Design a protein with these regions (language model features):
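Juxta-kinase regulatory segment immediately upstream of eukaryotic protein kinase catalytic domains
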Residues: 128-172
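Hydrophobic residue at the +6 position relative to the catalytic HRD Asp in the kinase catalytic loop
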Residues: 310-312
Length: 454
């Protein structure tokens, strides 16, 4: 009685307003301490029940973080939900493990036990085996020799048998082996994970914190969800702890460096790998993935964008990898907001082509869509401060970076002109950028010559 509805226009709602809570809404509520109120917590739990599993898994770091502040969200929300689905259970259990600190260890251990108690016996058994697998990965990272690493990989399956991957419970592996050690800064290990059906999944076991890479893949997922016609190629990232982690290797890819030095153009490489597809289809893929990669790099402030950190898949999609430098940081002190190489422009038909013009327009349209969700990109990035705990990435620095990138006070036309100028500047290949690409490659080659495999 006495209830009535007002349209969003009269309430001055944003264009992103919806009748139910979105992921973006929950982040805003959690960051402003509105979750202290019991009715708000109930609304959040109701929203969680409506979200798809992929979105829940992508946001699990934030959900666990908020639940640690308001533990009733664990008891009445996350634990009952996760205990019914194996993928959610694995994501939640390992995220609790990852967020343990001296202050939170007791709470999160209690939550893990509660989650296991509510789950079925089969799910508990599968989780236990996967926990042993994660420990095996950690032991392989610390192993002093390749013989020891091989022994650990072989012994695991003798003791435990087939096991589900912690980042994808639908994949069950029966064997794994360490193939080689790469000659890059952290000397990552290349591993092959073999399934019973004969499929093989290659991963990098990295001796460095990969939580920022996971943040990047989460942001890439949301770029795909909130824009039209652009595409960010994402891959699995699983932090083992704050010192090492696993990154999925994308099959059938080459770095732009490899293509450039094979005396083959990017367009020729793509066409020779897709003989049954038209040039237009291939160029559309290049345009969509280049726009997505550029917008992700622009949003995060990616640095260290040399030719070995940009890949192209055999089916014509460009992919950024290695997200160690963000918020404008760069080991060589470059101030490049996004990287567009001559090879990419050539694959689109040249700087004056209609395809390149459509790329610029697509980037502008997608950027306009992303500006509607400016606070969302801030909240995703600020996990570097509140969840990862990187003191160099203070929330005020991330706030200023986000405001600089999305200029929420400007009109649509002014912002569109700004992103167009950023794209145009990114297409200018400078002599310094060429020099950086050459020195990076030479450095890796020398590392490979002088590093001895132990």
């Amino acid at each position: 009685a006495g209830q009535y509805q007002l349209p969003c226009r009269k309430l001055l709602c944003s264009r992103a307003c919806r009748p139910t809570l979105s992921v973006e809404d929950i982040l805003r509520l959690g960051m402003t301490n509105c979750l202290e109120e019991s009715p708000v917590q109930r609304w959040v739990i109701e929203a969680w029940r409506l979200f798809d599993n992929i979105s829940m898994i992508k946001m699990m770091p934030w959900w666990v973080h908020f639940c640690c502040k308001f533990e009733t969200l664990f008891k009445h929300g996350l634990v009952p939900l996760a205990s019914q689905r194996m993928d959610l259970m694995f994501a939640m259990w390992f995220e609790c493990d990852l967020q343990k600190t001296p202050r939170l260890t007791h709470t999160l251990q209690r939550v893990q036990k509660s989650l296991e108690a509510d789950a079925s016996a089969e799910m508990r058994s599968e989780l236990l085996k996967t926990r042993h697998l994660v420990q095996c990965f950690k032991n392989i990272v610390r192993a002093p020799s390749k013989e020891r690493r091989a022994g650990l990989a072989t012994a695991f399956f003798k003791d435990h048998g087939p096991v589900r991957l912690p980042w994808n419970v639908d994949i069950v592996i029966v064997r794994m082996c360490v193939i080689k050690q790469l000659a890059s800064s952290s000397n990552p290990l290349v591993m092959e994970l073999h399934c019973k059906n004969g499929a093989c999944h290659s991963v990098l076991l990295k001796r460095e914190d990969v939580r920022t890479d996971r943040t990047a893949m989460g942001m890439g997922y949301w770029v795909n969800q909130l824009t039209s016609d652009v595409y960010v190629h994402t891959y699995d990232v699983f932090p083992l702890n704050d010192q090492c982690g696993i990154v999925q290797m994308i099959p059938q890819t080459k770095t732009l460096y490899e293509i450039r030095h094979s005396k083959e153009s990017l367009l020729n490489y793509i066409m020779s790998s897709n003989e049954t597809l038209s040039v237009k289809t291939l160029r559309d893929r290049v345009v969509a993935s280049t726009a997505g990669a550029c917008l992700l790099a622009f949003t995060m402030g990616l640095g260290d964008r040399h030719l070995e950190n940009i890949l192209v898949s055999s089916d014509a999609f460009l992919v950024h990898v290695d997200f160690g430098y963000v918020l404008g940081d760069d080991p060589k002190r470059q101030r490049t907001q996004m990287r567009i190489t001559e090879d990419m422009i050539d694959a689109m038909g040249g700087h004056q082509s209609a395809t390149f013009a459509s790329f610029v327009r697509l980037t502008q349209l997608a950027y306009g869509s992303m500006r509607i969700h400016t606070s969302f990109w801030y909240h995703l990035l600020v996990s570097e401060c509140f969840i990862v705990g990187d003191k160099s990435r203070h929330w005020k620095r991330i706030r200023d970076h986000t405001l600089d990138r999305f200029v929420p006070g400007e009109g649509h036309d002014e912002a569109s002109v700004q992103i167009e100028s950023v794209v145009e500047k990114a297409t200018e290949e400078t002599w310094f950028q060429t020099f950086v690409d050459m020195t990076h490659s030479a450095s890796n080659q020398m590392t490979g010559i002088f590093r001895m495999e132990l």
